[in-house]
């Protein structure tokens, strides 16, 4: 059996196996256990009572977290005319059409979110092989194909997170960083859970939100007592 590192031993001593943690206690413990030199993200995994093999039970959406994620988000927008001016005014890092597509084809993909107005999809459609594998392809289901590009830019900059269920029916997303106020983290997670409940597939039966786990980038996962959340 492999020896545990000092960090692994410290984590093992602090965590109670099988325990469901009050959210605020879990956030405090994860912060205490974070010893890496960079600011770790705090992530949440939500196990949903869905069958991801059924197309009508795939959960895919986006949520604007009230306190953001603590990350600087770079946004590119495909649009033109007055909408382009509105996107720039809303804080977009780059706005264009064919010129922007050419840059991306050449390898300039230093963006976290790509947004497009419907009339720009003729240009964006050429970029499927470039944007798709990076999870950047605009999609109306998560609000990144929209005539109101300015609002989409503001949402992205404010800390909107996008997610979809994986093959096990779990959604994963970042909800903040180590050092965030625990109450703000809690409110971010509550906003996410409220949105997940709002878009619950009609064909999903039984318990919908089965398990919520909070973790840091390099740290352990703590199961959250759902009774400690208001969502």
Swiss-Prot record:
- UniProt keyword annotations, A-Z: Repressor, Ribonucleoprotein, Ribosomal protein, RNA-binding, rRNA-binding, Translation regulation, tRNA-binding
Q: Name one GO molecular function term.
A: tRNA binding
Asked whether the UniProt record includes rRNA-binding among its keywords, one would answer yes
Q: Tell me the GO BP annotations in alphabetical order.
A: regulation of translation; translation
Naming one, the record's GO cellular component terms include:
cytosolic large ribosomal subunit
Write down the InterPro entries for this protein, in alphabetical order: Ribosom_uL1_bac-type (IPR005878), Ribosomal_uL1 (IPR002143), Ribosomal_uL1-like (IPR023674), Ribosomal_uL1/biogenesis (IPR028364), Ribosomal_uL1_3-a/b-sand (IPR016095), Ribosomal_uL1_CS (IPR023673)
Keyword presence, Repressor:
yes
Per UniProt, subunit arrangement is:
Part of the 50S ribosomal subunit.
Q: What does this protein do?
A: Binds directly to 23S rRNA. The L1 stalk is quite mobile in the ribosome, and is involved in E site tRNA release. Protein L1 is also a translational repressor protein, it controls the translation of the L11 operon by binding to its mRNA.
For this chain, the family text in UniProt reads:
Belongs to the universal ribosomal protein uL1 family.
What's the name of the protein?
Answer: Large ribosomal subunit protein uL1
The organism of origin for this protein:
Pseudomonas syringae pv. tomato (strain ATCC BAA-871 / DC3000)
């Amino acid at each position: 059996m492999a020896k545990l590192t000092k960090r692994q031993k410290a984590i093992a001593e602090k965590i109670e196996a099988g325990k469901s943690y009050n959210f605020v206690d879990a956030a405090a413990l994860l912060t205490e256990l974070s010893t890496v030199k960079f600011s770790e993200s705090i992530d949440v995994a939500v196990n949903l009572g869905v069958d991801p093999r059924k197309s009508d039970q795939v959960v895919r959406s986006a949520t604007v977290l009230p306190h953001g994620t603590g990350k600087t988000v770079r946004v590119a927008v495909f649009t033109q005319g007055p909408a382009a001016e509105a996107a720039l005014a809303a804080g977009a890092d780059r706005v264009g059409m064919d010129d922007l597509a050419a840059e991306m084809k050449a390898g300039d993909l230093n963006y976290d979110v790509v947004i497009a107005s419907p009339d720009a999809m003729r240009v964006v459609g050429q970029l499927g092989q470039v944007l798709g594998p990076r999870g950047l392809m605009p999609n109306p289901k998560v609000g990144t194909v929209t005539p109101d590009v300015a609002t989409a830019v503001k949402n992205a900059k404010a800390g909107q997170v996008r997610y979809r269920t994986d093959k096990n029916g779990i959604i994963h997303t970042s909800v903040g960083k180590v050092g965030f106020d625990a109450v703000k983290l809690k409110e971010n997670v509550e906003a996410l859970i409220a949105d997940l409940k709002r878009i619950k597939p009609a064909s999903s039966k039984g318990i919908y939100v089965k398990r919520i786990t909070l973790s840091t980038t390099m740290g352990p996962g703590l199961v959250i007592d759902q009774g400690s959340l208001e969502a």
